[in-house]
Amino acid sequence: MAKELSGYGPTAGESMGGTGANLNQQGGNNNSNSGVHWGGGSGHGNNGGQGNSNSSGSTSTVMKTGESYLTPWGDVVINNDGLPVMNGIVMTEENSTLVDNPFGGVSRVLNSLISDMPSLFAESSGNNNNNTASVNTAPTNAQVSDMDKSSKVVSNVINEKQKQKNKIATQISEKQKKIEEMKKVFKHHSYHGITDLERDVDELQKKSNQLDADISKLNSYKNTLQSKIGDVNKQKEAEEKARENAEVAEHETLNEEKQAVAEAEKRLAEAKAELAKAESDVQSKQATVSRVAGELENAQKSVDVKVTGFPGWRDVQKKLQRQLEAKQAEYSAVENELKNAVSFRDGKAAEVKEAEQKLKEAQDALEKSQIKDAVDTMVGFYQYITEQYGEKYAKIAQDLAEKSKGKKIQGVDEALAAFEKYKNVLDKKFSKVDRDAIFNALESVNYDELSKNLTKISKSLKITSRVSFLYDVGSDFKNAIETGNWRPLFVTLEKSAVDVGVAKIVALMFSFIVGVPLGFWGIAIVTGIVSSYIGDDELSKLNELLGI
């Protein structure tokens, strides 16, 4: 069994990909000389690539050219040939040895350093495979929390060695005092009692000097850890700032496009209102033209019917003619007004069409950005899975998402039976501490953030999701972790997916991966739940990856 502590701290093995998820070994198995065994975690990992492992819980990771990890005796860098280099020297079976380090792990170290500082080491690990760089060492980008834990462990080791040094100093002082007392009694200084004490003092002084060297080396290692913690914190701050800036820019872009849609909708509403008003004006003027046309027709008839033979008939005829001409002028005027109103109405109709086109363009732009945002979310999700748990795990997650599209939901009993079989083996792999950590993470869920993730992931899968189901799923998930009864969660998932299918379950459960720090085993449970709805093939892949 690989020891728990690595180059950075008690949990540093777990920092290399969530308790060993991305840990793998290339070429062959652990009992051969063909593998490249760079480092191990705390017993949760498995081996992948082209080989397999017969080790009892040890984990390993393939490190890339140029990567390095930290040991108490300096950095180990992987050269272009994939070999470990310390102090500029390629470590081989002849010039280096795997030894227990002071913190409970195992490291490959140059023999010259072992001879220089023997008291830092326990005994050899018994495995000096020249392809083995180190066991239980963490890469330099290990999490700050792990490095901080290791720094505290180093401090404890330093304190312990200082206590040993103080004890030795007391012993030296006591023996020197006895020597002085004996010299007063025995003038012949070659008296064997004196020489024995002097020899003891010399041996104790050598141990004290060695402890000084150890303490100096450990202080240097501690300072290096603290420096790296600062560097990692700065890098994390810079990355977080860049991420925040990107999110702000993306948010601003979406806000601008949402604003553009809102403005286009407002303009369309205004244009339609103006068109309605113009249409009403046209109808009013049409009624006026119709009325004046009737009056003009009557006036024309009055003129056409000439009645003569009474006094003043000529004056009457002239008056009727003037009335006709007035109506003709009025008709011409209202007819022109109608033409203008119709032209104005047609212009407003054109404005409505233009506003509708502008709205469509704004909506298309917003839709495109939202889709891009959703795609970016999934790309970021797979990248996160890759960084935390490895490419194989990310590939499984991607396969689950793709295979869920269009897949109808199966019965609760069938999916639950598949999951229970998987979970029964999984339960043996993680402890109550792991289970409590998952429960606590689910206790502190930010459902506002989770709902945003659900919306984006759902959009990328081209489905719609009700945010309300998140609360039910989160509650049932938490209760299942606490009680071991998973049926209520599967019932809730089936209810949520009855209209859309398995893609809804993927969206819901992946939202928890993105938004909740579930840890490696929490993610293993989530992907196991989703896989149980997809099929045995996906569960088999997951089992193989987890080594169960």
UniProtKB/Swiss-Prot annotation:
Composition skew (Low complexity), residue ranges? 21-36, 52-61
UniProt keywords, alphabetically: Antibiotic, Antimicrobial, Bacteriocin, Host membrane, Membrane, Plasmid, Transmembrane, Transmembrane helix
Q: What is its main location?
A: host cell
Pfam families on file: ColA_N, Colicin
Compartments where found: Host membrane
What are the cysteine partners in each disulfide bond? Answer: none
Kindly give the PROSITE patterns that the UniProt entry links to this protein: CHANNEL_COLICIN (PS00276)
Spans through the membrane: 505-525
State the Gene Ontology terms under molecular function.
Answer: pore-forming activity
Q: State the Gene Ontology BP annotations.
A: defense response to Gram-negative bacterium; killing of cells of another organism
Which segments show compositional bias classed as Gly residues?
37-51
**Which Gene3D superfamilies does this UniProt record tie to the protein?**
2.30.30.970, Colicin
- Cellular compartments per GO CC: host cell membrane; membrane
Record bears the keyword Flavoprotein: no
SUPFAM superfamilies named among the record's database cross-references: Colicin (SSF56837)
Q: Where is this region: Disordered?
A: 1-63
Whether Transmembrane counts among this entry's keywords is yes
Q: Name the family the entry cites.
A: Belongs to the channel forming colicin family.
Function per UniProt: This colicin is a channel-forming colicin. This class of transmembrane toxins depolarize the cytoplasmic membrane, leading to dissipation of cellular energy. Colicins are polypeptide toxins produced by and active against E.coli and closely related bacteria.
Mind telling me what this protein is named?
Colicin-K
Gene designation per UniProt: cka
